[in-house]
Structure formats: structure tokens, C-alpha cells
Amino acid sequence: MPKYEIMTILDPKAEMAIIDNLLKTVFGDNSTEKLRKLETTNLAYSIRKSKIAQYFLVDLNAPTNLIEEFVRRANITREIWRYLIVNLDSEKGLNKKPKIRERNRKYTLRRDRFDKPNFRGNPKSRFDQQDQQATKNQQNFQQNQQNQASQYRENSRQNQDDFQQVSSNQQNFGQNQQNQSGYHRENNRHNQENMHQNNKNHQNQTSQTQRNRRQYQPIKNPKFNQKEKENYNNKKPQSSN
């Protein structure tokens, strides 16, 4: 049967009987023999607006199904804020100390973090470092100059393309204006010619109508002589019987 170590964090106002009754209900009466309260009361972070709590630790042997039942009951118990279950057969418990590592040929002692490393294997003079820094700065400056020049050329090319596009648009606009002006002038000329022709036709038609009226109108004026009257009557078309 696997061995477990269970640590629970309870509300600081809760009683020890809560965890005691829970362990007896799930694991039996003998499960609380190794139950003890830890001295630690501070929390790493606030739980339910509280920075202190009660810590309880217990070691026991139990099957997996009882551990699941304990988890279920602990989740529905309001006074139990947190819990941690450790399988001692596969993991290290909270009270166990780590074993001292055996030193062998493959193990080297780790350097203390306060010890300064030794960088004297390849010492360099201050002048060499300055020369290297100056060379690096010069390379960076040249690289920046090249980048700026390439960027300036790219911007100039883009501006030239934009200017050509604007000029082309202006030319197209002027051409369209000229085409529209010529089209309007041509339409106006055709309209004027048509209007003049219509007026001329109307005048001709009016003149012809007036002549026809004068030609076929009977003479009623007594000033005309008899000869003119006969000539007029002879010109008048005879109606067929």
C-alpha cells in the first residue's frame, strides 16, 4: 500500500477537529496518530484576504481510491483552503533532507556565487580594447552611412515616380478637358446649324402658305377691273362635276 504525506492549510479561526474528523471519516480512526500542527503560520500570498493560516501535516498508508475521496471532501470543506498530497514512494516528502552527493571523478565542486571568475587566461591591454572598440564604432558608422544612403536613394526614386505619376495625371486631365471642350463646341455648332435650317424651313413654309392663300382667294375688292378678275378666275382650278 503506498505511503502518502498530506499537508493542509486551514482557516486561522478553524479548529483542529475539522481535519481530525475528515481523516477519521476517510482513512479510519488510526489515521490521526501522526497528525501534527506546524509552527508556520505565514502565507506566501493572501488567501481570502488573510496572510496567516494553520498548517497540518500527516503521514499515512492508504489506497488510491481513499486519496480521491479525501480530495473530494477537502474541496467541499470551506475551512480547508489548500492541500498538498505527496506520494512518498515516488517523490520526496516535506521532512526528508536531500542526500549528500557523492563526490567522484565526474563531480566538480560548484563555484560560490560570490567568487569572482578568473579571466587571466588571455589578458588584453587597455589599448587593444580601445582599438577594437574604435574599429567596431567605425564599422557601425560606415554601416549606418550605407543604410542612410540606400534609404535616401529609395526615397528619391519613390518621389520621382510620384512626380511622374502626378504629371501624367495632369496631362490626362488637360487632354480630357480639351476633348470635352471640342465635343461641346461641335455639338453647339450642329445645334445652331439645325436651328438655322429649321428656321429657314419654317420661313419657306410660311411664305408658301401665304402665296397659296393669295392665289386661291376670290377677289372681292371692287377696285380690280374686269380683266384681272377674268384672269384670276381662269387660273383657279375647275371643280369636276
From Swiss-Prot:
Family statement: Belongs to the bacterial ribosomal protein bS6 family.
Gene name per UniProt: rpsF
GO MF term (any one): rRNA binding
An annotated GO BP: translation
Skewed-composition ranges (Basic residues): 97-108
Region Disordered, residue ranges: 97-241
Keywords: Ribonucleoprotein, Ribosomal protein, RNA-binding, rRNA-binding
InterPro entries: Ribosomal_bS6 (IPR000529), Ribosomal_bS6_sf (IPR035980), Ribosomal_S6_plastid/chlpt (IPR020814), Transl_elong_EF1B/ribsomal_bS6 (IPR014717)
CDD domains: bS6
Name the UniProt record assigns to this protein: Small ribosomal subunit protein bS6
Annotated organism of origin: Mesomycoplasma hyopneumoniae (strain J / ATCC 25934 / NCTC 10110) (Mycoplasma hyopneumoniae)
An annotated GO cellular component: ribonucleoprotein complex
Function of the molecule: Binds together with bS18 to 16S ribosomal RNA.
Start-end of Low complexity biased regions: 130-151, 161-182, 194-210
One Pfam short name: Ribosomal_S6
Biased composition (Basic and acidic residues): 109-118, 183-193
